[in-house]
Regions:
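Conserved Class I SAM-dependent methyltransferase catalytic core
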Residues: 90, 96-105, 145-216
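Non-catalytic substrate-recognition/targeting regions of SAM-dependent transferases
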Residues: 1-5
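Residues immediately flanking
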Residues: 126, 141, 178
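Aromatic/histidine-rich interaction motifs
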Residues: 7, 11
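Short SAM/SAH-binding signature in class I
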Residues: 134-140
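Conserved S-adenosyl-L-methionine
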Residues: 12-130, 145-146, 150-152
Length: 216
């Protein structure tokens, strides 16, 4: 999509991240968190969806140099996409990762994607994670080649389950290739969906909680 110049090991595909944002019902006023943000793809794609930023809006295409395609058509369509951006959207995205290099990458990628003012990324351990009120958590916990150690992946899923159940948000959507994720997480998902991250077969585990409301 033109914004991810650098990425961490085994990043999630941008198109898959956008699909997860759709499944997570991200809206213009959503608050999205990711405790394992890596290079920031899930949070960035959620921000672009909330703001109605067209994919590839900030990149250039080889077809723009084709003689038989009038230049004004490209300019017209690009301006149309810009006019449809929801500048008044109240979206906020927050990502966390234990790796400072990944956090620096995520912040740089958000700026390249045009959502640097709507997203922020911080260095933090998953044990410190707290879901904010009415937040939607979209995450891709480390597994397989991202981690290399199945026992460590299980430990991270267990920790995520503990902090989630202590501070549940509006919804949690976790994509992983770990077939025993629910067992490690400590709770059966409300829904599951089979999905692929590139050639890696995964499951998207979906957990729902009722949004907190102010008392009248």
């Amino acid at each position: 999509r033109g914004y991810r110049k650098n990425a961490t090991l085994a990043p999630i595909k941008e198109t898959l991240a956008a699909a997860i944002a759709d499944l997570g019902r991200v809206r213009r006023d959503s608050l999205v968190q990711d405790p394992f943000c890596g290079s920031g793809t899930l949070v960035i794609e959620a921000a672009q969806k909330a703001l109605n930023l067209a994919p590839g809006l900030r990149r250039r295409f080889a077809a723009e140099h084709f003689d038989f395609v009038p230049a004004d058509i490209w300019a017209e369509q690009r301006q149309k996409a810009l006019d449809e951006v929801r500048k008044d959207a109240a979206f906020e995205g927050i990502g966390y990762d234990i790796d400072p290099a990944a956090v620096a990458l995520a912040n740089a990628n958000a700026k390249l994607a045009g959502v640097g003012d709507r997203c922020r990324f911080e260095v933090a351990d998953v044990r410190e994670f707290r879901a904010l009120d009415n937040a939607t958590v979209l995450t891709n916990p480390p597994y397989g080649e991202r981690l290399g150690d199945a026992s460590e992946a299980a430990s991270l899923a267990r920790t995520l389950g503990q902090v989630w159940q202590a501070h549940p948000a509006q919804g949690l959507y976790a994509i992983t290739a770990d077939a025993e994720f629910e067992q490690h997480f400590g709770k059966k998902a409300a829904r599951r969906r089979k999905i692929y991250n590139g050639m890696i077969p995964c499951q998207l585990y979906m957990y729902f909680e009722q949004p907190k409301r102010e008392r009248k």
